[in-house]
């Protein structure tokens, strides 16, 4: 007799589904910001790169110095009377001699005829600085590029030839700007120009003809003299619905997801690596020159060209509600010595900073200073903020509760209309999760932010994760989640779980996949929802799953019970192997493995330095259905903790015991294949 499956509709259990269920989360990870969503083509245009970003980086990273034979030029770095004290470094070009010296008139003539003088223009006769962009600059036929630069010429006016250089080293477009005379401590002048790459077949669209993929911006100095340079910028003029400073094809990929909300800026970016790296929203608005740069927790640089104002404009353009996230007065817990709080004496000022964001979004620009700044940037009407996230993956201890409660109470008192989203740690289980939920219930936090990065098998095995959530307690925002790969099985596992989130849409109020963007060749995390390079956008299976749910929304869920065979049993491999990985430093002593039949294997001590997987010498072919691992572990420091993987560690299914992250122990079953997917 064939198996029979009976489905029964539970009419009494009808539930309303949140109208804000499906959204997106943008964090500047994997070059998502500068070099990604930010349309700026110049890398390190403010000359602020330094060793805090990467040990090998300096003020001239991404710049190439060109000094032709017969010329003399020295390129230095200054800090005297800068354009902006927030970003004090600038380039100094000291041009002592130019081979075949030119005048300003000859520089203009050279720019006018640059396209016909292709051979000589490959190597300029005068000293030059050339910016290589982010993996090269893509130039498109018919596109107009807006150029700007701050200059300070010492003693006399000096011309600067500006050229867009193609893959073959020849100019595609050129012009000349002239810096007026000043002095070493004098006034700066911002110069602007536009450069258009002409073509009879041109159309200034994101898919216009690409004529260079490894292009560059070249600044040529045709006359002797000294000139200071800062905040060099080059942006294509094409936009998505007039949204400036954003790469249009990436915005289009976001808009096509039809997100109900967008979370920003993080993630770990929010509270940073230490208080000096903490994200302060008010330092990311106003003139870009006065937005203090900082290192990025993911290993590069943040210019904050896409700051909070640009974020709100992006939300407005794609029809998503903003969900800004601010630190809970704590730095990130994923550092060697754990989180550091904002000092109590500084908490009143920090609370004012939090309240200021709400005013920036919602207050009347005629009566509020923060709203007046919004209006000065071009947006008189409010942004209609509804949600505010406080904290991210925090260690839920007494200090966190103290700082969070102060902020939470202040927001409730000043703005009862704002829905606060709290945090319950980095995983859907463990100490932070349990304590976070307990505190959220006690404090009456409206929504809590859960995170869950898991194997495909975990999602299939935990479809009931929200079935038994307390309907009278805080609602859930699954703010970061994803299945560990980009294969079809991963998209299917996410789709299955999203269906159950929709079924529980009365308590799961919001959800967003993470991370959102990743630039090929610069991935800090994998998988991601949208991959890109300088030319194209790539959408893996998970993207289409997100789009499917967001474009086929429901408002009511009817629970269904199933009677009959609903699972398929698959045997798991019983291979026994061991490895240690993770980013922390730890010593393993008295290491041993014992199987259920009494086989005892002594393993060598390991001093793990956090620099890659270390395999343990387990006898080849060892197999067991159950076994015990013993070790004395001394944990020192490092990001993300350390993990002992056991089982079929080179296959698709194994166990992982993680130590140190949040100063706790977590045991999970890892799996990327069908064996754990049933």
For the regions a language model picked out, list residue spans one by one:
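Alpha-helical scaffolding within the catalytic cores
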Residues: 3-11, 70-79, 245-249, 305-311, ...
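Catalytic-core region of carbohydrate-active enzymes that cleave or remodel glycosidic bonds
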Residues: 314, 409-412, 416-419, 437-442, ...
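Active-site beta-loop-alpha junctions enriched in small/polar residues
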Residues: 27-29, 264-269, 327-329, 390-395, ...
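Active-site groove signature of glycoside hydrolases
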Residues: 221-222, 230, 265-268, 325-333, ...
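Hydrophobic faces of well-ordered beta-strands that scaffold small-molecule active sites
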Residues: 20-26, 262-264, 322-324, 386-390, ...
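Extracellular and organelle-lumenal recognition/adhesion modules and their flexible linkers in secreted
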Residues: 1-303, 321, 336-348, 386, ...
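Substrate-binding cleft/loops of secretory-pathway carbohydrate-active enzymes
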Residues: 333-342, 349, 377-382, 425-457, ...
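Conserved, mostly hydrophobic/aromatic
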Residues: 24, 47, 149, 258, ...
């Amino acid at each position: 007799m064939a198996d029979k499956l009976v489905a029964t509709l539970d009419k009494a259990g009808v539930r309303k589904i949140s109208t804000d269920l499906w959204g997106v989360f943008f964090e500047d990870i994997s070059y998502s910001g500068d070099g990604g969503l930010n349309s700026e083509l110049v890398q390190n245009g403010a000359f602020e790169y330094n060793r805090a970003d990467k040990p090998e980086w300096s003020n001239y990273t991404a710049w190439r110095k060109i000094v032709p034979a017969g010329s003399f030029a020295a390129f230095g770095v200054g800090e005297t009377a800068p354009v902006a004290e927030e970003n004090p470094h600038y380039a100094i070009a000291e041009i002592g001699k130019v081979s075949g010296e030119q005048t300003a008139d000859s520089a203009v003539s050279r720019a006018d005829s640059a396209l016909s003088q292709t051979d000589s223009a490959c190597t300029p006769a005068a000293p030059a600085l050339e910016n290589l962009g982010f993996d090269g600059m893509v130039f498109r036929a018919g596109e107009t590029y807006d150029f700007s630069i701050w200059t300070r010429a010492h003693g006399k006016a000096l011309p600067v030839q500006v050229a867009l250089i193609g893959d073959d080293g020849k100019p595609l477009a050129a012009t000349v700007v002239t810096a007026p005379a000043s002095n070493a401590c004098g006034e700066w002048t911002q110069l602007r120009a536009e450069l258009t790459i002409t073509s009879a077949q041109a159309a200034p669209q994101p898919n216009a003809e690409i004529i260079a993929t490894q292009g560059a911006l070249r600044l040529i100095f045709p006359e002797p003299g000294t000139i200071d340079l800062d905040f060099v910028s080059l942006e294509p003029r094409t936009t998505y619905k007039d949204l400036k400073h954003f790469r249009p094809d990436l915005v289009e990929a976001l808009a096509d997801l039809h997100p109900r909300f967008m979370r920003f800026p993080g993630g770990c970016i929010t509270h940073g690596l230490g208080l000096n790296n903490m994200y302060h929203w008010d330092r990311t608005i106003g003139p870009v020159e006065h937005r203090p740069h900082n290192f990025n927790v993911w290993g590069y640089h943040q210019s904050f060209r896409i700051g909070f104002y640009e974020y709100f404009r992006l939300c407005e353009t794609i029809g998503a509600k903003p969900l800004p996230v601010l630190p809970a007065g704590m730095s990130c817990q994923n550092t060697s010595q754990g989180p550091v709080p904002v000092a109590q004496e500084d908490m009143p000022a920090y609370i004012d900073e939090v309240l200021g964001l709400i005013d920036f979004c919602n207050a009347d620009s005629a009566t509020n200073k923060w709203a007046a700044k919004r209006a000065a940037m071009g947006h008189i009407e409010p942004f209609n903020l509804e949600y505010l996230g406080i904290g991210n993956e925090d260690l839920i201890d007494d200090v966190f509760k103290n700082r969070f409660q102060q902020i939470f109470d202040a927001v409730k008192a000043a703005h009862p209309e704002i829905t606060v989203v709290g945090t319950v740690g980095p995983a859907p289980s463990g100490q932070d999760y349990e304590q976070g939920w307990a505190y959220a219930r006690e404090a009456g936090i409206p929504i809590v932010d859960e995170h869950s990065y898991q194997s495909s098998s975990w999602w299939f095995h935990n479809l009931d994760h929200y079935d038994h959530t307390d309907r009278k307690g805080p609602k859930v925002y699954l703010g970061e989640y994803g299945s560990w790969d980009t294969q079809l099985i991963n998209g299917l596992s996410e789709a299955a779980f999203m269906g159950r989130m929709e079924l529980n849409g009365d308590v799961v109020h919001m959800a967003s996949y993470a991370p959102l963007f990743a630039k090929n060749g610069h991935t800090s995390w994998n998988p991601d929802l949208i991959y890109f390079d300088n030319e194209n956008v790539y959408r893996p299976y998970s993207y289409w799953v997100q789009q499917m749910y967001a474009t086929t929304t429901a408002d009511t869920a009817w629970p269904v019970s199933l009677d009959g065979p609903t699972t398929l049993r698959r045997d798991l491999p019983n291979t026994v192997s061991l490895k240690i990985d993770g980013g922390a430093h730890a010593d393993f002593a008295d290491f041993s493995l014992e199987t259920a039949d009494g086989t005892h294997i002594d393993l060598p001590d390991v001093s793990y330095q956090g620099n890659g997987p270390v395999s343990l010498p387990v006898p080849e072919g060892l197999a067991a259905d159950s076994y015990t691992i013993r070790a004395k572990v001394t944990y020192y420091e490092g990001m993300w903790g350390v993990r002992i993987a056991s089982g079929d560690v080179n296959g698709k299914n194994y166990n992982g015991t993680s130590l140190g992250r949040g100063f706790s122990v977590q045991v999970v079953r890892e799996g990327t294949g069908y064996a754990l997917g049933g």
